């Protein structure tokens, strides 16, 4: 029984290490995937480029009537001026511009996750800030609250505080009148 368990342990480790040390040809796998991707992209670009002209030379060389279908024409007039090469060129230009603008809802600016979080936080702040009023609560305005009014209503100088005036004083000069605002350190 002991021999069987040792043999199983030996075979298991051999199989594990053998599979671990077997070299995979990563470069050839990558090359295969790359070639497949490049081939499919080339086919897609070939189909797209043959569906509509890409430049002015293609418009002059190719037939212009294929770009304007009778369904696309507005109005009942079917004059020969509407299907002229100039009209077709304008039509192609508008078509290309609309396709470039429609390629997904492009968002300009930062595309990182942190920027998205900051934008969302800013929007939340804007939405919630409109209901707030700019007046402090009465409990904060009172003499027991915080702010300028409390500092004004405090007693002049307590035993643990020192008064410092905003104006420099000479030695032996009298203290400033009680009407001026003292500064505490």
From Swiss-Prot:
PANTHER family: ADRENOMEDULLIN, ADM, PRO-ADRENOMEDULLIN. Its main location: secreted. The gene is ADM. Pfam families: Calc_CGRP_IAPP. Residues 60-87, 133-185 are annotated as: Disordered. This is Pro-adrenomedullin. Keywords: Amidation, Cleavage on pair of basic residues, Disulfide bond, Hormone, Secreted, Signal. Residues 45-92, 148-185 form a propeptide. It is found in: Secreted. GO terms for cellular component: cytoplasm; extracellular region; extracellular space; secretory granule lumen. Coiled coil: none annotated. Numerous actions have been reported most related to the physiologic control of fluid and electrolyte homeostasis. In the kidney, ADM is diuretic and natriuretic, and both ADM and PAMP inhibit aldosterone secretion by direct adrenal actions. In pituitary gland, both peptides at physiologically relevant doses inhibit basal ACTH secretion. The modification Arginine amide is found at residue 41. One of its GO terms (molecular function) is signaling receptor binding. GO terms for biological process: adenylate cyclase-activating G protein-coupled receptor signaling pathway; adrenomedullin receptor signaling pathway; branching involved in labyrinthine layer morphogenesis; cell population proliferation; developmental growth; G protein-coupled receptor internalization; heart development; inflammatory response. The modification Tyrosine amide is found at residue 146. Belongs to the adrenomedullin family. It comes from Homo sapiens (Human). The record marks 116, 125 as: Required for CALCRL receptor interaction. Residues 1-21 form the signal peptide. Disulfide bonds join 110-115.
């Amino acid at each position: 029984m002991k021999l069987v368990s040792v043999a199983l342990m030996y075979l298991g480790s051999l199989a594990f290490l053998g599979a671990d040390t077997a070299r995979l040809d990563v470069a050839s796998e990558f090359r295969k995937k790359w070639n497949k991707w490049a081939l499919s992209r080339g086919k897609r670009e070939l189909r797209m480029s043959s569906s509509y002209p890409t430049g002015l030379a293609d418009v002059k060389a190719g037939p212009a009537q294929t770009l304007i279908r009778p369904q696309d024409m507005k109005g009942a007039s079917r004059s020969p001026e509407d299907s002229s090469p100039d009209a077709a060129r304008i039509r192609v230009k508008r078509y290309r511009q609309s396709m470039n603008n429609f390629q997904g809802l492009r968002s300009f600016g930062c595309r990182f996750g942190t920027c998205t979080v900051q934008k969302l936080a800013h929007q939340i702040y804007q939405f919630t800030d409109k209901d707030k009023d700019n007046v402090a609560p009465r409990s904060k305005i009172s003499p027991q609250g915080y702010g300028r009014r409390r500092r004004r209503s405090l007693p002049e100088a307590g035993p643990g505080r020192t008064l410092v005036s905003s104006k420099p004083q000479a030695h032996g000069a009298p203290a400033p009148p009680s009407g001026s605002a003292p500064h505490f350190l």
